Amino acid sequence: MTALAIRGGHLLDPAAGVDGPKDILFKDNRVAEIAAPGKLKLANGAETLDARGLVVAPGLVDIHVHLREPGQGYKETIATGTAAAAAGGFTSEIGRAHV
């Protein structure tokens, strides 16, 4: 079992009513626990990331995307455009027609 703790980040989750500093524990790529800063009990070997001063949020949705296919794949492909979005924290995109 792999464990990762993100410590002290400003967690923003409007659906859960959370807006403030938290520690988040992930086990096997799933959220296992959310606690006040410094309150997580970690097993030996757990990786930790210091997120103080950073925002931690669920995946973002880009509601206005123009992917360049078909017709302008030399500028950007669906694969490169969605990879760039994922690198920026976007887990969903709403594509617009590019005419």
Residue ranges and their predicted role:
Residues L11, T48, L60-D62:
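Intrinsically disordered, low-complexity peptide-like regions
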